[in-house]
Amino acid sequence: MIRVLVIDDSLFIRTVVQDMLSDDPDIQIVGVASDGLEALDKIRELKPDLITLDIEMPRLDGLSMLERKKEIDRFPKTLVLSSLTSEGAEMTKRAIALGADDFMLKPRGIKNIREIGGELKHKIKNICTIAYITAKPVLKDSNARNVVLIGSSAGGPPMLDTIVSKLPSDLNAAVIITQHMPKGGFTAALAARLNRISPLQIRETENGDVLKNGTVLVSRAGFHTIISSVLDKGGSQSGKIILTDSPPVHNVKPAVDKTFISAAQVFGNHCVTAILSGMGNDGGEGTEAIKKAGGVTIVCREEDCLVYGMARSALSRNCVDHVLSLQAIPEKIVETIRAMNG
């Protein structure tokens, strides 16, 4: 049983979070607090396993509270609930730097609650079970000949935890994650958090990045991540990141399709794709492009996804090689990359 303390100055958010978690037999709400000072007292008293934490609160805000976490023996795991603003994104990045374990966007209203309830439960359980990587090997600086492409939206972040934590540090490929998120810094915070739990080096994309083996790039929100061809000193082809501010595709930016289609043109049959949870049709056309180029295509099975729109779009095009459980996807990725390298 995971014991949770809900911390938020909004009665609406406190009530919503309690309602979303109340039907899960593995989670118990042990209390609520409306500001950081009250929360510190309740952490000492109730000893929760995890707190959901608002940042902007009276008396003592969430960041100041995290700065005081050393005052408490065995400070609980921390899930930040962030507002959908550029300021909220910046404060979320600071919270991750101060030791928060994960974050997610607050529900915008009643219609949004069902969409995020499942993700909230997944995140809480992931946070309490996943291990941090404290030291990473120094990798040989080698341009990637193979690329792994992962696309996800609603419900995707907890699934990304599972995948990146199980990929080996010597993966002979670059990895690009395209996760639908609002711009303003949320994808940087996602990359920083994933970097803690993976043996691979993970960061947000920068314009001009050359794809390297053993590295994971998270597509920067507000731009499409395009892969173009680049030659290394030995004349071998690899890929380079171009961030473009072209119009949204499927009403999102970054779009999975833009990344997948460009990768197919550069890496051809040296691509592996995986579509995870997400609503809408993004990723279907891109998966088809990878399949036509000779790459290997994967979608997660429906029972492991919060929303099955993106995976269903790919399946409807008859271009999917493997429908797998979430737990089986990392193993299949590694197996496929090894086969590509002979």
From Swiss-Prot:
The UniProt GO MF terms for this protein read:
phosphorelay response regulator activity; protein-glutamate methylesterase activity; protein-glutamine glutaminase activity
Q: In the UniProt record, does the keyword Methyltransferase occur?
A: no
One GO biological process term? chemotaxis
What enzyme category does the UniProt record give?
A: hydrolase
What InterPro entries does this protein map onto? CheB-like, CheB_C, CheY-like_superfamily, Sig_transdc_resp-reg_Me-estase, Sig_transdc_resp-reg_receiver
Domain called Response regulatory: residue spans: 3-121
Which CDD domains does this entry report, sorted A to Z? CheB_Rec, REC_CheB-like
Taxonomy, superkingdom? Archaea
Which is a Gene Ontology cellular component entry for this protein? cytoplasm
Q: Which UniProt keywords apply?
A: Chemotaxis, Cytoplasm, Hydrolase, Phosphoprotein
Cite the Gene3D superfamilies for this sequence: 3.40.50.2300, Methylesterase CheB, C-terminal domain
Q: Main localization of the protein?
A: cytoplasm
Instruction: Tell me what PTMs the record reports for this protein.
Output: Phosphorylated by CheA. Phosphorylation of the N-terminal regulatory domain activates the methylesterase activity.
| E.C. designation(s) | 3.1.1.61, 3.5.1.44
Purpose: Involved in chemotaxis. Part of a chemotaxis signal transduction system that modulates chemotaxis in response to various stimuli. Catalyzes the demethylation of specific methylglutamate residues introduced into the chemoreceptors (methyl-accepting chemotaxis proteins or MCP) by CheR. Also mediates the irreversible deamidation of specific glutamine residues to glutamic acid.
For domains, the record's comment is: Contains a C-terminal catalytic domain, and an N-terminal region which modulates catalytic activity.
Query: Family, per the entry?
Result: Belongs to the CheB family.
Q: What is this protein called?
A: Protein-glutamate methylesterase/protein-glutamine glutaminase 1
